[in-house]
Amino acid sequence: MLSKRIIPCLDVKDGVVVKGVQFRNHEVMGGIVELARRYASEGADELVFYDITASSDERVVDKSWVSRVAEVIDIPFCVAGGIKSVEDARQILEFGADKVSINSPALADPTLITRLAERFGVQCVVVGIDSYFDAQSGHYQVKQFTGDESRTRTTAWHTLDWVEEAQKRGAGEIVLNVMNQDGMRQGYDLEQLKLVRAVCKVPLIASGGAGAMEHFRDAFTLADVDGALAASVFHKGLIPIPELKRWLKTEGVAIRE
């Protein structure tokens, strides 16, 4: 059985790590390199960095900190933010990232997923999906440009359809960001994760809503996700990673020490 992954998520804006609630009202959490070093030493399995305004600002992720992070940690890390071309991805991978994640640019040009997968291998290509439950329609919809409230828009894609399309085009991993739950610390959206799991044949990472150790366990055992991503509970020290991993092990979850 493959070990489940615990993945701190670091949203980057203006050169520092920030965290909002439902993608709004961001507050500063700390320095990029300092937090990366801390999480690596605490036993995180992987890190994900989102330059949250890169796509909405129409620029690519700032690479200066990517190489600094690569120098100080020895765990895999993934970088996202405005990656629109094979060349953008090549530079980020050359600076030391292990994976690139694409979100809004993949929605604008789905062929980007295939081009990246063919050039670097599917194991390097993550597709991030910002999914929002629209209570009026009863559908899970995919949102775009979520780093900037003024530019955020609902796409024509239903979440499950986009998950299937992204896989067909070569996504090696899916990160499902559940916008309704983001920063609320009420638990992952297990119902949506189960629906996505049923159509997702590549590794699936849950994101949005972790607030207690039980939430991680439930995502792993009830929705069968491969990794659980969280931000505020780690940044604010509410759940220490070593403690979380020890507890998950006692709950029967296959976890790396």
Curated annotation (Swiss-Prot):
It is an enzyme of class 4 (lyase). It comes from the Bacteria. It catalyses: 5-[(5-phospho-1-deoxy-D-ribulos-1-ylimino)methylamino]-1-(5-phospho-beta-D-ribosyl)imidazole-4-carboxamide + L-glutamine = D-erythro-1-(imidazol-4-yl)glycerol 3-phosphate + 5-amino-1-(5-phospho-beta-D-ribosyl)imidazole-4-carboxamide + L-glutamate + H(+). Belongs to the HisA/HisF family. Heterodimer of HisH and HisF. PANTHER family: IMIDAZOLE GLYCEROL PHOSPHATE SYNTHASE HISHF, IMIDAZOLE GLYCEROL PHOSPHATE SYNTHASE SUBUNIT HISF/H IGP SYNTHASE SUBUNIT HISF/H. This is Imidazole glycerol phosphate synthase subunit HisF.
